[in-house]
């Protein structure tokens, strides 16, 4: 499962190429991922300009604008094996099947020319093509009207661990009645968003805190030691391109290297 650094690596790789571009064509090769695509998904994306490409927790969010329409957002979650790839106008992705009308599904993609498990293709106004492949199909996409938090996927997320809202006092309050191990508490996205098993284990080890220690028994002194370590581990992973092993290359296909720095 990709965690915050992996998703942020993808965002940083794609944002310069997506922001300001218009989506001119949408091709869906199936009607669902983990969940069905929202009604009118392809039609709404086509003709929209990407005004921003951001991240919230483990979600990617594209801010979209269409003439005479309210701003809306395209939300994506990579699941376990989802990956975006961006191909230039001369790239092989332009050969992935024939153009289809928005809302239709293409099943005539040639195995000789298609990358495996590509389920979504977006053509941009500069001729480049963004593909989304997901062998296990645990990822999903949604469209959100108005503010991004107008979806249950984001509404109850805790603070970002790299933000000023994440501090020892926040954890002390959140852990006060938690009788689960601190590792489990840190994995609760309502307490802090974006953390997963890899970086929680690494941060706890570096901070000298047992992952089995009950969250309610972790005092302020230990939490004041833990918070900067979490930030340090995440930032180091982002700078290294994530801890990609196999399923999560960056948008250009390059692997991350933070796994070579693991202490645990």
Which positions does each model-derived feature cover?
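Structured catalytic/nucleic-acid-binding cores of DNA maintenance enzymes
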Residues: 1-264
């Amino acid at each position: 499962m990709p965690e915050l650094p992996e998703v942020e690596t993808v965002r940083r790789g794609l944002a310069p190429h997506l922001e300001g571009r218009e989506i001119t064509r949408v091709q869906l090769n199936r009607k669902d991922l983990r969940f069905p695509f929202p009604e009118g998904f392809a039609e709404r994306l086509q003709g929209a300009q990407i005004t921003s490409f951001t991240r919230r927790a483990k979600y990617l969010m594209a801010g979209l604008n269409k003439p005479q329409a309210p701003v809306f957002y395209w939300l994506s979650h990579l699941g376990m094996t989802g990956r975006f790839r961006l191909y230039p106008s001369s790239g092989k992705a332009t050969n992935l099947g024939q153009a289809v009308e928005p809302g239709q599904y293409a099943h005539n993609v040639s195995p000789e020319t298609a990358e495996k498990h590509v389920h979504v293709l977006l053509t941009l106004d500069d001729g480049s093509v963004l593909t989304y492949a997901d062998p296990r199909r645990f990822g999903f996409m949604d469209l959100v009207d108005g503010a991004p938090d107008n979806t249950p996927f984001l509404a109850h997320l805790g603070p970002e661990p790299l933000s000023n809202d994440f501090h020892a006092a926040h954890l002390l309050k959140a852990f006060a009645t938690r009788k689960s191990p601190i590792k489990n508490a840190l994995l609760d996205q309502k307490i802090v968003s974006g953390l997963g098993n890899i970086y929680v284990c690494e941060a706890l080890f570096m901070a000298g805190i047992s992952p089995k220690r009950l969250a309610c028994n972790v005092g302020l002194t230990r939490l004041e030691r833990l918070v900067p370590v979490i930030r340090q581990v995440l930032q180091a992973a982002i700078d290294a391109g994530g801890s990609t092993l196999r399923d999560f290359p960056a948008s250009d296909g390059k692997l991350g290297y933070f796994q070579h720095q693991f202490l645990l």
